[in-house]
UniProtKB/Swiss-Prot annotation:
It holds the Pfam family Kelch_FKB95. Residues 1-11 have a biased composition (Polar residues). Keywords: Kelch repeat, Repeat. This is Kelch repeat-containing protein At1g19460. Residues 16-26, 38-52 have a biased composition (Basic and acidic residues). It comes from the Eukaryota. It comes from Arabidopsis thaliana. Residues 1-55 are annotated as: Disordered.
């Protein structure tokens, strides 16, 4: 960005009435080129200092405070104005300011597959100019590999493994959710598909993802975020299961809960112990195939029970007392079927429960109303005496409409 003084007319170029216009333009162009050439010869540190002072003369602290007040959905437009704003929006200091001012926002990232596309693409759930929730495609991000595992750390998502054609990927990709740019990280030693993953003490643990577990396989790999290297853990591995492709996984109370044909509980902070009583744990009573959608809110596992075993379609598991409870509420009893069946996805949206579901199949039976597409229900949760959890539908919106037979593959949320 140039100062006003640099844009004003030059009396030496434009003040001689005897010169032809072509000569004036040519002479000014030469002067500008010479000036730019001289500027390019400055030391890098001096050039960067000049650019900072010229690009935006307002103090950085004041600019940062002003930008923090702007909604995150407007940041992409602002970042395209100049490199100064792009770097500001990509900085961790800006989001620390937003958090300090109580302006942090929760964003949901979903992998959405269209009938004629393969594989799914990344979409972000946000509020538009009129405060309606909408899903918008993130054009800058690559497609989402089938069967990948995703973990979130701060303002970043890590996409691990997956399937390309019939090949299991060793890749791990980091997505910076501030700028929606991505980069590749060091590869795993083994390709993985439908692996379990969790973050503990600055390390990403990845378990399984093979067709079958073998004694000499790197069944567990650990990525050190600080050193940026992968290491294999030799074991001991649980003797109760030879599974290596999992349906779902969740982290609660520093434990990694893994759902397969048999179920596992892994504790990295206790020297990699496996829970020996896992098959007697009541968590497997309602968290099971085929409806494996789940999310963790306040260290409790929420999932769907299509059979309404406890009288309600949404249930919650508390690992402290190892009990299942229904999420009660009259408005939850009347949720459309596509929210409480296999094919939907749920996530922790800033302490609220959000479920995405496609109503395309309902139109075939004629029992669906509203616009066809992907719908989002936002449920406010309330803890009551006796450990009861109650839910109330806060909003119900079509967030990606006029398209039939969309499918939701996964959901992740971050606070920015």
């Amino acid at each position: 960005m140039a100062n006003i003084s640099e844009i004003s007319g030059d009396s030496n170029d434009g003040g001689d009435p005897n010169k032809k216009p072509e000569e004036q333009v040519l002479r000014r162009s030469r002067r500008i080129a010479t000036r730019n050439e001289n500027q390019n010869k400055k030391p890098k540190e001096e050039e960067e200092k000049d650019n900072r002072s010229v690009s935006f003369p307002i103090p950085n602290e004041l600019t940062e405070a002003c930008v923090a007040l702007i909604r995150k959905c407007d940041y992409p437009s602002l970042s395209s104005v100049s490199s100064y704003f792009f770097n500001l929006i990509a900085s961790s200091e800006l989001y620390e300011t937003r958090s300090r001012l109580g302006l942090s926002e929760t964003f949901l990232y979903a992998a959405i597959r269209f009938p004629d596309t393969n594989p799914p693409n990344w979409y972000i759930l946000h509020r538009n100019k009129v405060s309606s929730l909408r899903l918008s495609k993130l054009e800058s991000l690559p497609p989402v590999p089938y069967g990948c595992s995703v973990v979130t750390i701060g303002q970043e998502m890590y996409v691990i493994g997956g399937l390309l054609d019939v090949r299991r990927l060793q890749l791990m990709t980091l997505i910076d959710c501030r700028t929606h740019k991505c980069r590749s990280l060091p590869k795993m030693k083994r390709g993985r598909y439908h692996a379990a993953a969790g973050v503990f003490d600055g390390k990403i643990y990845v378990i399984g993802g093979f067709r079958m577990r073998k004694p000499d396989a790197e069944w567990i790999e650990v990525f050190d975020l600080k050193k940026q290297i992968w290491e294999s853990l030799p074991g001991p591995y649980p003797k109760t299961s030879m599974d290596s492709q999992f349906f779902a996984h969740a982290v609660m109370e520093d434990k990694l809960y893994i759902l397969g044909s048999r179920c596992l509980i892994y504790e990295p902070k206790r020297n990699g112990e496996w829970d020996a009583t896992v098959n007697a744990n009541p968590i497997w009573n309602l968290w099971k195939v085929p409806c494996t959608m789940q999310c963790v809110i306040d260290d409790m596992l929420y999932t769907i029970d299509p059979q309404c075993t406890l009288g309600h379609p949404i249930v919650v598991y508390n690992p402290k007392d190892k009990t299942w409870r229904p999420v009660k509420g009259e408005s939850l009893r009347t949720l459309p079927s596509y929210f409480v069946s296999d094919g939907s996805e749920m996530a922790n949206f800033g302490g609220k429960l959000v479920i995405l579901g496609s109503n395309g199949s309902c139109y075939d039976t004629g029992d669906c109303i509203g616009e066809k597409g992907i719908w989002c229900v936002m449920i406010e949760l309330e803890k009551r005496e006796g450990g009861e959890i109650w839910g109330k539908v806060e909003s119900l919106d079509c967030v990606l409409g006029d398209i039939n037979f969309l499918s939701v593959w996964l959901c992740q949320t971050l606070t920015l």
